[in-house]
Regions:
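Short glycine-enriched nucleophile-adjacent loop
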Residues: 167-178
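Short, surface-exposed "cap/lid" segments of acyl-processing enzymes
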Residues: 69-74, 78-110
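Catalytic histidine-centered segment of alpha/beta-hydrolase-like enzymes
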Residues: 314-324
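N-terminal secretory signal peptides and thylakoid transit peptides that target proteins
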Residues: 2-19
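Conserved alpha/beta-hydrolase "acid-adjacent" motif
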Residues: 287-293
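Alpha/beta-hydrolase
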Residues: 199-281
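Conserved acidic catalytic loop of the alpha/beta-hydrolase fold
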Residues: 140-156
Length: 343
């Protein structure tokens, strides 16, 4: 027999490539339009809100199929947490002309979720400050957003999805405020970062991150996100172009806080204090972590409702890949898991 914290074979899902998703989760052809935020064409109801973290204004985005109506069943809430180099909309509501559906907000709104995301301090439409927007700052951002989401939706617990440093933000928030987290998806996550090629390369700039609160984020840097792991064929070049076209309207500087944290302060999350059900999802070519590092974290999670999924032919940016439909399928299966029967 195995203990609750041991790694059972049934817990580790190596997702095969064919036939995983169809219908709403399939990649559909899109009409040619200018790149930027996903065009809704009246299909969705959207809203924006502002949270305050002291003097810092934080922009929050919401999308669902229809406007909220009195007496309707309360929809499940999915909150998406962005990473180090892109703000919320280019991460989760991107339109790539003629290339199919890339907007997670669209995908999950169609699946019946009330979908939310936010720009962290120093990103997108949120306040630019003298700070470096590190992981701890991101947790405070989420704490500021949660009361607004609860008030507008009637729910006090939400599903969270975070990718890359967004996964660290989401996990750290789940550790700090477990009563607000229903199910948690950690995508392209990093625990201790041991033997991770991307972090080894990034650490060469550690002194810069220690002495500067912003870093250059130009078109070449954005493109490198999709090529640095040695599998550029996993991505359509139009994705990097669409992200750059959208993001560079906010300038060429990004906060250094998450880079500093990931190169000098890991681990930032204690897995034994993450109490919610957890899905850990990664691409098989992702250089931000290793299987050994992530399985170390996974094996310490106290909740037996957990999954570890590796997607083939995917590098760091899972939900921007050609195989993103596989990720959407796995995420939906996890979020819609029926309640367990107590024994």
């Amino acid at each position: 027999m195995t203990s609750d914290n041991s790694i059972a074979r049934r817990d580790i899902i190596l997702a095969a490539g064919a036939g995983l998703a169809s219908g709403l989760l399939a990649s559909a052809a899109a009409e040619a339009q200018a790149p930027g935020v996903a065009e809704t064409g009246g299909e969705f109801w959207t809203a924006e809100y502002t949270a305050k973290k002291g003097e810092v204004s934080l922009q929050i985005y919401r999308k669902r199929l229809t406007a909220p109506a009195a007496g309707e069943p309360v929809k499940p809430v999915l909150f998406l947490v962005h990473g180090s180099s892109n703000a919320a909309q280019s991460s989760y509501d991107l339109h790539v002309p003629g290339k199919g559906e890339y907007s997670m907000m669209n995908i999950y709104a169609r699946l019946g979720y009330d979908v939310w995301t936010m720009d962290h301090e120093g990103y997108g439409k949120s306040s630019r400050t003298s700070g470096n927007s590190d992981i701890a700052s991101g947790v405070e951002d989420l704490k500021a957003a949660v009361p607004i989401v609860a008030k507008e939706t009637g729910r006090t617990r939400f599903h969270f999805f975070g990718t890359s440093s967004g996964g660290i933000r989401a996990a750290a928030f789940a550790q700090a405020q477990p009563q607000s987290v229903d199910r948690l998806v950690l995508c392209a996550f990093t625990y201790k970062g041991e033997n991770a090629p991307t972090l080894q390369q990034r650490a060469k700039q550690l002194e810069y991150y220690k002495t500067h609160n912003t870093r250059l984020r130009d078109r070449a840097m954005i493109e490198s996100i999709f090529t640095r792991d040695g599998l550029p064929s996993a991505y359509d070049p139009a994705v990097a172009k669409a992200i750059a076209d959208f993001e560079l309207q906010y300038g060429h500087q990004m906060p250094t806080g998450t880079y500093l944290d990931m190169t000098s302060k890991l681990p930032l999350v204690d897995p034994t204090k993450v109490l919610s059900p957890v899905l850990m999802l990664r691409g098989d070519h992702d250089g931000i972590s290793t299987n050994a590092d992530l399985l170390d974290f996974y094996g310490q999670l106290p909740n037996g409702d957990r999954q570890f999924v590796i997607l083939p032919n995917v590098a760091h940016s899972v939900t921007s890949s050609n195989n993103r439909h596989m990720a959407f399928h796995v995420i939906q299966a996890f979020l819609s898991m029926p309640p367990q029967v107590a024994s």
